[in-house]
A protein has these predicted regions:
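Hydrophobic alpha-helical transmembrane segments of membrane transport/permease proteins
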Residues: 2-8, 12-14, 55, 63-100, ...
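A short amphipathic helical element positioned immediately N-terminal to and/or at the very start
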Residues: 33-46, 97-100, 108, 225, ...
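Structural signature of transmembrane alpha-helix termini at the membrane-water interface
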Residues: 41, 63-73, 139, 194, ...
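Phosphate/oxyanion-binding loops and surfaces in catalytic or ligand/nucleic-acid-binding neighborhoods
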Residues: 59, 65-72, 235, 247, ...
Length: 319
């Protein structure tokens, strides 16, 4: 039909430059992948330890997703010998790479399945805590005065208590469940996130583009969501990456104290507090392997958080 340009046709632009109409269309998925690849390339070049940490964490995610495929045995099943008795406290060998616990269950399989609980608790609790803390920080930083005073006094009260003590108190009241643990850890994260976001908002408010948006008639919430929040994304991302490791440590501590995810669900902290602590002298591998898993994951999250901070903070980009 006349007047229509085929997708493969070439057209002449306003400056006389010929271009392909199909290529001129935006390709969001391609641009998204290009942005991700660009960010990864910068991370590898400038912060190789951060890139290695990201690789370790990606491997952990793959292990958690493919746990039914990668685990050599059922983590809940008692492995029996020829006489039908559980293979108890078998040290690491070719058949059981990380040994067996007092009930004959494979330790490696329980560690693999325990990564699921750690990741679920880590990502879910950090998401809840970061969202809540970001909301409180935005409101407190932009609307100063009485609102700021009330919110910050509440934040000071929560931060006066050690995080693990607050988590113990709330879990003791709400009871043991995975959902309660996620909510409790999110509640522990929120005050610190709120304080960081508030400071960032107070700094961003001093820029002239905020005054320009206000003069143009933008509503307060539009200024907060369209101008302040995008510029506060870098500190929020750094907080989340660092708190992921802390959330896993808190979950392991609660499990170690008997207030974590109830058995028989395998968790790294539960393995430390249960079989690992009771058999530390006779079978130290029951505590070594779960403890090593916790240490590696927390170290990887902390190193990734440091790398992101150095890359996103303008004051540290020259390092």
């Amino acid at each position: 039909m006349p007047g229509l340009i085929p997708e493969s046709a070439t057209v002449k632009g306003p400056q006389g430059v010929r271009r392909d109409a199909l290529k001129a269309r935006p390709r969001l998925p391609l641009r998204l992948w290009q942005g991700v690849w660009w960010a990864l390339s910068i991370l590898v070049r400038r912060k190789p330890l951060g890139a290695a940490s990201a690789l370790i964490l990606c491997g952990l995610v793959v292990v958690a997703i493919l746990a039914p495929v990668l685990a050599p045995y059922d983590p809940y099943k008692f492995n029996l010998n020829e006489r039908g008795l559980p293979i108890r406290l078998q040290p690491p060998n070719a058949k059981f790479l990380c040994g067996t616990d007092p009930l004959g269950r494979d330790v490696l399989s329980r560690i693999v399945y325990g990564s699921r609980v750690s990741l679920i608790v880590g990502f879910a609790s950090v998401a809840i805590g970061t969202l809540l803390g970001t909301l409180l920080g935005l409101v407190s930083g932009y609307w100063e005065g009485g609102v700021d005073q009330v919110l910050q006094r509440a934040v000071d009260t929560m931060m006066a208590l050690p995080g693990i003590v607050l988590a113990l108190a709330v879990v003791s009241v709400l009871g043991q469940s995975l959902t309660n643990i996620i909510l409790v850890i999110g509640l522990v994260i929120a005050p610190g996130a709120s304080r960081v976001v508030r400071g960032t908002v107070l700094s961003i408010k001093q820029n002239t583009f905020i005054d320009a948006a206000y003069a143009a008639g933008a509503t307060p919430w539009r200024i907060v969501l369209r101008h302040i929040l995008p510029n506060a994304f870098a500190p929020i991302l750094i907080i989340a990456s660092v708190w992921l490791g802390n959330a896993i440590v808190i979950e392991a501590a609660l499990s170690f104290l008997g207030l974590g995810t109830p058995p028989p669900t395998p968790t790294w902290g539960g393995m430390l507090s249960g079989e690992g602590r009771r058999n530390l002298e006779t079978a130290p591998y029951l505590a070594i392997f779960p403890g090593l898993a916790i240490s590696i994951v927390v170290l990887a999250f902390n190193m990734l958080g440091d790398a992101l901070r150095d890359l996103l903070d303008p004051r540290l980009r020259t390092r």
